[in-house]
């Protein structure tokens, strides 16, 4: 029951409070816009909404999204699917989550948000990830929750290169054309300003999995060289800069900030395939981690830190 309460609190905080890096990016975006402009009004409204939601402990957005848990493999016996599902049902009953889970065949609503495949649960090996270590140097297992709304999920897409309609070949120049096309097609439908999580390569399923995991990476992370490809680092910066010159702006109403961040990873591919997969996240980038130290279930809740790919 203690663990269920901790997961319940993780859900409440994730639903009602944005991570610090996302709030910082939204505030920086507001400072760039002309006072009284549509973009400034939208961003100010978003930030006011965030403050109210955090104060009241209520959802940031009416669409509390698909809940995806990433659970350290070392916690498998403590943080079981049953524990997670009980916490989700309690969170729904308390109003931290809306009734948001529908049977795709019958249209029936699962009013507690619990059924086969809901919530989404991944047990992952983090034991060798030095970035999950505590300040004392000991590795602490974690549970990360991501809540992704339907509006942003609908804007995710996948390209297959070469793409003659875009004039995109099988190289980073072609990848760039795909990503800027994705931003143009999203416009205001995905509740901009948003974040792009990208996977270059892999098969179709792996592409979406890895692209979505990029959304766990903090926007303001000073990621050390050697961990990631320098070419991808440069491409992230270029896409962010170019996307923010398109004039799409917050909610597609015009402005200087269309994207808050771009995070790109790559995976090997077979010669016959070259996929570019885009996982789009709206401004309500709800992600949070609970860190469980020691043998007992005590833990501290913190914003999700950078993760290595599954």
Where are the regions that the model predicts?
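Non-transmembrane, aqueous-exposed alpha-helical and coiled segments at domain scale
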Residues: 1-129, 139-198, 203-299
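Short, low-complexity, charge-dense intrinsically disordered segments
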Residues: 130-134, 298-310
């Amino acid at each position: 029951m203690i663990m269920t309460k901790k997961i319940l609190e993780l859900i409440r905080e994730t639903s009602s409070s944005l991570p610090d890096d996302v709030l910082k990016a939204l505030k920086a975006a507001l400072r760039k816009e002309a006072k009284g402009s549509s973009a400034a009004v939208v961003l100010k409204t978003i930030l006011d909404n965030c403050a109210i939601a955090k104060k009241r402990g209520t959802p940031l957005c009416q669409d509390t999204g698909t809940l995806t848990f990433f659970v350290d493999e070392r916690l498998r016996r403590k943080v079981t699917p049953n524990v997670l599902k009980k916490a989700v049902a309690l969170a729904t009953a308390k109003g931290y989550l809306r009734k948001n889970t529908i049977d795709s065949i019958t249209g029936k609503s699962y009013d507690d948000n619990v059924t086969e495949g809901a919530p989404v649960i991944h047990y992952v090996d983090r034991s060798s990830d030095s970035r999950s270590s505590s300040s004392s140097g000991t590795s602490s297992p974690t549970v990360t929750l991501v809540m992704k709304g339907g509006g942003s999920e609908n804007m995710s897409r996948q390209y297959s290169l070469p793409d003659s309609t875009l004039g995109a070949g099988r190289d980073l120049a072609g990848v760039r054309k795909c990503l800027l096309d994705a931003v143009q097609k999203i416009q205001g439908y995905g509740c901009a300003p948003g974040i792009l999580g990208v996977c270059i390569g892999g098969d179709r399923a792996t592409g979406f999995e890895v692209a979505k995991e990029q959304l766990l990476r903090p926007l303001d992370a000073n990621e050390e060289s050697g961990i990631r490809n320098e070419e991808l680092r440069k491409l992230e910066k270029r896409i962010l800069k170019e996307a923010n010159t398109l004039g799409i702006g917050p909610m597609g109403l015009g402005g200087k900030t269309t994207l808050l961040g771009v995070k790109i990873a790559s995976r090997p591919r077979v010669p016959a395939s070259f996929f570019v997969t885009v996982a789009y996240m709206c401004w309500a980038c709800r992600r949070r981690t609970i860190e469980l130290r020691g043998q007992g279930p005590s833990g501290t809740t913190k914003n999700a830190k950078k993760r290595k790919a599954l």
